[in-house]
Design a protein with these regions (language model features):
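C-terminal active-site/capping subdomain that shapes the small-molecule cofactor and substrate pocket
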Residues: 183, 187-275
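Short, acidic/small-residue loops that bind anionic groups at enzyme active sites
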Residues: 20-50, 56-64, 240
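Structural motif
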Residues: 5, 38, 178-182, 213
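Peripheral docking tails and interdomain loops at the edges
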Residues: 43-90, 236, 245-275
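Oxyanion-binding "anion nests"
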Residues: 137-190
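N-terminal small/polar loop signature for handling phosphorylated ligands or for N-terminal nucleophile
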Residues: 1-31
Length: 275
């Protein structure tokens, strides 16, 4: 096959690690036969595993949520991201979508062919602080998944399993990177969001990255609260933070390639990615 699209997330994805990271045949296949790999949410675990093995993957559309969209057509902005995989371009240009969509509440047969509720994008990419232009290699994922990797908040053995394979990048690996993070469909409360951001701070991530990209919250849940927490907890006014980027759980979504060098230009309100 030419590539793999994850079906959806999978909150116990970490349980795959012993079966894959100790399989020499699998590791050799990753090295010798690299393939396109795309997905988001708890797929973050897979992305970090492949990143460790040297494969550059895409935090982007998945099968059920995007290719399986129950409206008549895939969302145009997301479709463009998916098509970019197939075109093989050496660079990509990401702009804000002019429309955002609410998450569906009805996934029954009766909803087939119905359109999502839409809203005009009023804000676009927001520079919360720091330089208007910055660049670095892309690294990150779903904030809740990263938190789960570092704690036993969801499963009692997840932290131990992930530590065994050094899944979370060490501080040196974050140097010069652009951290990208986004919140999941559970719409974490501001209190939980603060704990999650604080944990990344305690790991020293914000001391060494060149900037932060934050995805639009699904349905714009806690939109202002999250902004306030990011600025207060990170507490480094020189670190660029760009908010409301179209990736992750909110519809529509672009694709961010792990390890690819991105140049964020907020004068142009664009993100340029060299693959």
């Amino acid at each position: 096959s030419a590539g793999i699209s994850c079906a959806i997330g999978g909150d116990d994805t970490y349980r795959l690690l012993p079966y894959l990271m100790e399989d020499e045949e699998f590791i050799k296949a990753v090295e010798e036969h690299p393939k396109l790999f795309t997905g988001f949410s708890d797929t973050t675990i897979n992305h970090l595993m492949f990143y460790k093995l040297g494969l550059s993957t895409y935090y982007g559309p998945n099968f059920i949520c995007d290719l399986g969209e129950i409206a008549d057509e895939m969302l145009p902005y997301t479709k463009r991201a998916f098509e970019s995989y197939l075109e093989g371009n050496e660079s990509d240009e990401i702009i804000s979508s002019d429309t955002w969509y609410e998450e569906r509440e009805d996934f029954s047969r009766a909803a087939i062919g119905t359109e999502r509720k839409t809203h005009k994008e009023e804000r676009g990419f927001e520079l919360l602080q720091g330089s208007e232009i910055f660049q670095g290699g892309l690294l990150g994922g779903c904030l809740e998944s990263l938190y789960d990797v570092l704690t036993n908040s969801r499963y009692e053995d997840e932290k131990e399993v992930c530590e065994r394979y050094d899944l979370f990048p060490n501080k040196e690996e974050w140097i010069g990177k652009i951290l990208f993070i986004e919140t999941c469909e559970e719409k974490p409360t501001p209190e939980l969001f603060e704990r999650e951001v604080l944990l990344l701070k305690e790991k020293g991530v914000f001391d060494v990255v060149n900037g932060v990209l934050v995805g639009k919250p699904q349905d714009e849940a806690y939109y202002q609260e999250y902004k306030d927490i990011l600025i207060r907890v990170i507490d480094n006014e020189k670190l660029p933070i760009v908010y409301n980027v179209n990736f992750g759980h909110a519809m529509p979504r672009c694709a961010l390639q792990y390890g690819a060098v991105a140049k964020v230009d907020m004068k142009q309100k664009k993100i340029y990615v060299n693959r």
